[in-house]
Protein backbone atom coordinates (compact mmCIF):
# COMPACT_ATOMS: atom_id res chain seq x y z
CA UNK A 1 0.00 0.00 0.00
CA UNK A 2 1.29 3.46 -0.87
CA UNK A 3 0.30 6.85 0.49
CA UNK A 4 1.28 10.31 -0.67
CA UNK A 5 0.70 13.31 1.57
CA UNK A 6 1.40 16.46 -0.49
CA UNK A 7 0.69 18.77 2.47
CA UNK A 8 3.64 17.22 4.34
CA UNK A 9 5.74 16.57 1.20
CA UNK A 10 6.16 12.86 1.96
CA UNK A 11 5.51 9.45 0.41
CA UNK A 12 4.87 6.34 2.48
CA UNK A 13 5.25 2.75 1.33
CA UNK A 14 3.77 -0.03 3.45
CA UNK A 15 4.88 -3.65 3.46
CA UNK A 16 2.68 -6.24 5.17
CA UNK A 17 4.47 -9.59 5.17
CA UNK A 18 4.91 -12.78 7.19
CA UNK A 19 8.68 -12.41 6.86
CA UNK A 20 9.90 -8.83 7.24
CA UNK A 21 13.44 -9.83 6.22
CA UNK A 22 12.13 -10.22 2.65
CA UNK A 23 10.73 -6.69 2.74
CA UNK A 24 13.97 -5.33 4.20
CA UNK A 25 15.97 -7.05 1.46
CA UNK A 26 13.70 -5.50 -1.21
CA UNK A 27 14.30 -2.05 0.27
CA UNK A 28 18.07 -2.59 0.52
CA UNK A 29 18.20 -3.77 -3.09
CA UNK A 30 16.06 -0.87 -4.35
CA UNK A 31 18.30 1.71 -2.63
CA UNK A 32 21.57 -0.20 -3.17
CA UNK A 33 22.26 -0.43 0.57
CA UNK A 34 24.05 -3.19 2.46
CA UNK A 35 22.56 -2.20 5.81
CA UNK A 36 19.54 -0.20 6.91
CA UNK A 37 19.66 2.22 9.83
CA UNK A 38 18.95 0.63 13.24
CA UNK A 39 17.90 -2.74 11.84
CA UNK A 40 19.65 -5.70 13.37
CA UNK A 41 18.85 -9.36 13.86
CA UNK A 42 16.37 -8.76 16.70
CA UNK A 43 12.93 -10.14 15.89
CA UNK A 44 10.37 -7.37 15.52
CA UNK A 45 6.71 -7.07 14.54
CA UNK A 46 6.93 -3.67 12.89
CA UNK A 47 9.33 -0.88 12.04
CA UNK A 48 9.32 2.57 10.45
CA UNK A 49 12.34 3.32 8.28
CA UNK A 50 12.89 7.04 7.84
CA UNK A 51 16.46 7.20 6.56
CA UNK A 52 15.26 7.94 3.01
CA UNK A 53 13.37 11.10 4.02
CA UNK A 54 16.11 13.66 3.25
CA UNK A 55 16.93 12.39 -0.25
CA UNK A 56 13.71 10.71 -1.45
CA UNK A 57 11.03 12.16 0.88
CA UNK A 58 10.07 8.54 1.47
CA UNK A 59 9.19 6.54 4.59
CA UNK A 60 8.78 2.77 4.75
CA UNK A 61 6.45 1.09 7.24
CA UNK A 62 6.88 -2.66 7.68
CA UNK A 63 4.26 -4.67 9.58
CA UNK A 64 4.50 -8.40 10.20
CA UNK A 65 1.40 -10.38 9.27
CA UNK A 66 0.34 -13.38 11.33
CA UNK A 67 -2.13 -16.18 10.78
CA UNK A 68 -4.59 -14.13 12.86
CA UNK A 69 -4.13 -11.12 10.59
CA UNK A 70 -2.49 -7.71 10.86
CA UNK A 71 -2.11 -6.86 14.55
CA UNK A 72 -3.86 -3.52 15.09
CA UNK A 73 -1.74 -2.82 18.20
CA UNK A 74 1.44 -3.08 16.13
CA UNK A 75 -0.07 -1.14 13.23
CA UNK A 76 -1.21 1.81 15.34
CA UNK A 77 2.10 1.76 17.26
CA UNK A 78 4.05 2.09 14.01
CA UNK A 79 1.66 4.75 12.70
CA UNK A 80 2.54 6.80 15.80
CA UNK A 81 6.25 6.53 14.86
CA UNK A 82 5.32 7.42 11.28
CA UNK A 83 3.48 10.52 12.53
CA UNK A 84 6.50 11.73 14.52
CA UNK A 85 8.84 11.24 11.55
CA UNK A 86 6.49 13.18 9.24
CA UNK A 87 6.14 16.03 11.72
CA UNK A 88 9.89 16.16 12.40
CA UNK A 89 10.55 16.25 8.63
CA UNK A 90 8.27 19.30 8.45
CA UNK A 91 9.88 21.13 11.37
CA UNK A 92 7.13 20.59 13.96
CA UNK A 93 8.22 20.28 17.55
CA UNK A 94 6.33 18.52 20.30
CA UNK A 95 6.36 21.44 22.75
CA UNK A 96 3.44 23.75 23.59
CA UNK A 97 0.76 21.55 22.09
CA UNK A 98 0.61 18.06 20.70
CA UNK A 99 -2.58 18.76 18.73
CA UNK A 100 -0.99 18.79 15.22
CA UNK A 101 0.59 15.40 15.99
CA UNK A 102 -2.67 14.01 17.37
CA UNK A 103 -4.68 15.22 14.37
CA UNK A 104 -2.28 13.68 11.83
CA UNK A 105 -2.00 10.45 13.86
CA UNK A 106 -5.79 10.08 14.06
CA UNK A 107 -6.23 10.76 10.35
CA UNK A 108 -3.47 8.30 9.37
CA UNK A 109 -4.90 5.55 11.59
CA UNK A 110 -8.39 6.10 10.21
CA UNK A 111 -7.30 6.20 6.56
CA UNK A 112 -4.89 3.26 6.75
CA UNK A 113 -7.18 0.94 8.73
CA UNK A 114 -10.10 1.94 6.50
CA UNK A 115 -8.07 1.12 3.37
CA UNK A 116 -7.03 -2.26 4.78
CA UNK A 117 -10.65 -3.13 5.61
CA UNK A 118 -11.81 -1.95 2.18
CA UNK A 119 -9.15 -4.16 0.56
CA UNK A 120 -10.38 -7.18 2.54
CA UNK A 121 -7.32 -7.49 4.77
CA UNK A 122 -7.78 -9.45 7.97
CA UNK A 123 -7.18 -7.37 11.11
CA UNK A 124 -6.45 -8.81 14.53
CA UNK A 125 -7.50 -6.89 17.65
CA UNK A 126 -5.63 -8.47 20.59
CA UNK A 127 -7.29 -8.27 24.00
CA UNK A 128 -5.16 -7.10 26.93
CA UNK A 129 -6.70 -8.38 30.15
CA UNK A 130 -4.67 -5.87 32.19
CA UNK A 131 -6.65 -3.00 30.67
CA UNK A 132 -10.29 -2.98 31.74
CA UNK A 133 -12.89 -1.15 29.67
CA UNK A 134 -16.44 -1.09 31.01
What are these regions (language model features)?
Residues 1-21, 58-59, 83, 90, ...:
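N-terminal low-structure segments adjacent to metalloprotease catalytic domains
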Residues 79-97:
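Catalytic Zn2+-binding segment of zinc metalloproteases
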Residues 70-78:
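Short alpha-helical catalytic segment bearing the HExxH-like zincin motif
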Residues 93-126:
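Post-HExxH zinc-binding segment in Zn-dependent metallohydrolases
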Residues 9-17, 47-53, 57-65, 73, ...:
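Ordered hydrophobic segments in well-structured contexts
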Residues 66, 70, 93-96:
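Short, solvent-exposed segments of well-ordered alpha helices
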Residues 25-69, 82-85:
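Active-site scaffold of zinc-dependent metalloenzymes
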Amino acid sequence: MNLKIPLYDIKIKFYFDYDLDKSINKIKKKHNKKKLYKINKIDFDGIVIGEFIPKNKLIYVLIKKTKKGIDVDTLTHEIYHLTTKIMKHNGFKFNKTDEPFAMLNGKLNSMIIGKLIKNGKKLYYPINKKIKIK
